[in-house]
Amino acid sequence: MRIDNRELNQLRSISFERHYTKHAEGSVLVSFGDTKVLCTASVESGVPRWLKGKGKGWITAEYGMLPRATNTRNQREAARGKQSGRTQEIQRLIGRSLRAMIDLSKLGENTIYLDCDVLQADGGTRTASVTGAAIALIDALESIQKTKKLKADPLIGLVAAVSVGMKDGEAYLDLNYEEDASCDTDLNVVMTQKGEFIELQGTAEEKPFTRAQADDMLVLAEKGIAELIAMQKTALGW
């Protein structure tokens, strides 16, 4: 039994609150336990310069944490004048993950910006961001369909993400902050609803992991992501 009384293979309490803000074409407040992230999707006509004239769209993401998302205040990155390497890494991960949901050739020359703002952090902010932003992206697509009438549906399918870890030879699903800080290995996994992998990010701390342990973590991640995608479908009314 874990510190929050979950089983090793159990997700935290997950929720999605759609249409959380009124201005964005898509907005979702996603909660993975005590981790809460506001994900908004904004649609703009036009694409980056290197895509102009190609008839394709673009999807990109930004990520940030509110100053008091953690137990001590962190200075805003805007006040520091630069983004941290961690922030840049995470927002690239989110963008890559969400582009796997969409056939960009069917999006027209439109750009969708996904903004993921961490309101409260207790581990798994990047995986919560991917999973929540996927729903916001679908709501934004519906907005485009209503106003611009795309010739074909660009949606390929849902994606979701979860963290897994290895501690004392046992695999843990959906790590909170304390678990993430104390695990021998932590791994972030992003997958499609077809069970295909988009991203694997794994690191061992002090104690390397074996191939068998990697397989154990991936099996657990597949289970968790299948459950998350089922929850996404419920939230979307599918």
UniProtKB/Swiss-Prot annotation:
<comment type="function">
    <text>Phosphorolytic 3'-5' exoribonuclease that plays an important role in tRNA 3'-end maturation. Removes nucleotide residues following the 3'-CCA terminus of tRNAs; can also add nucleotides to the ends of RNA molecules by using nucleoside diphosphates as substrates, but this may not be physiologically important. Probably plays a role in initiation of 16S rRNA degradation (leading to ribosome degradation) during starvation.</text>
</comment>
<dbReference type="InterPro" id="IPR020568">
    <property type="entry name" value="Ribosomal_Su5_D2-typ_SF"/>
</dbReference>
<dbReference type="GO" id="GO:0000049">
    <property type="term" value="F:tRNA binding"/>
</dbReference>
<keyword id="KW-0808">Transferase</keyword>
<dbReference type="InterPro" id="IPR001247">
    <property type="entry name" value="ExoRNase_PH_dom1"/>
</dbReference>
<protein>
    <recommendedName>
        <fullName>Ribonuclease PH</fullName>
        <ecNumber>2.7.7.56</ecNumber>
    </recommendedName>
</protein>
<dbReference type="InterPro" id="IPR027408">
    <property type="entry name" value="PNPase/RNase_PH_dom_sf"/>
</dbReference>
<keyword id="KW-0698">rRNA processing</keyword>
<dbReference type="InterPro" id="IPR036345">
    <property type="entry name" value="ExoRNase_PH_dom2_sf"/>
</dbReference>
<dbReference type="InterPro" id="IPR002381">
    <property type="entry name" value="RNase_PH_bac-type"/>
</dbReference>
<dbReference type="InterPro" id="IPR050080">
    <property type="entry name" value="RNase_PH"/>
</dbReference>
<keyword id="KW-0820">tRNA-binding</keyword>
<feature type="binding site">
    <location>
        <begin position="124"/>
        <end position="126"/>
    </location>
    <ligand>
        <name>phosphate</name>
    </ligand>
</feature>
<dbReference type="GO" id="GO:0000175">
    <property type="term" value="F:3'-5'-RNA exonuclease activity"/>
</dbReference>
<feature type="binding site">
    <location>
        <position position="86"/>
    </location>
    <ligand>
        <name>phosphate</name>
    </ligand>
</feature>
<dbReference type="InterPro" id="IPR018336">
    <property type="entry name" value="RNase_PH_CS"/>
</dbReference>
<dbReference type="Pfam" id="PF01138">
    <property type="entry name" value="RNase_PH"/>
</dbReference>
<dbReference type="InterPro" id="IPR015847">
    <property type="entry name" value="ExoRNase_PH_dom2"/>
</dbReference>
<keyword id="KW-0819">tRNA processing</keyword>
<dbReference type="GO" id="GO:0009022">
    <property type="term" value="F:tRNA nucleotidyltransferase activity"/>
</dbReference>
<dbReference type="GO" id="GO:0008033">
    <property type="term" value="P:tRNA processing"/>
</dbReference>
<keyword id="KW-0694">RNA-binding</keyword>
<comment type="subunit">
    <text>Homohexameric ring arranged as a trimer of dimers.</text>
</comment>
<keyword id="KW-0548">Nucleotidyltransferase</keyword>
<dbReference type="Pfam" id="PF03725">
    <property type="entry name" value="RNase_PH_C"/>
</dbReference>
<dbReference type="GO" id="GO:0016075">
    <property type="term" value="P:rRNA catabolic process"/>
</dbReference>
<dbReference type="GO" id="GO:0006364">
    <property type="term" value="P:rRNA processing"/>
</dbReference>
<comment type="similarity">
    <text>Belongs to the RNase PH family.</text>
</comment>
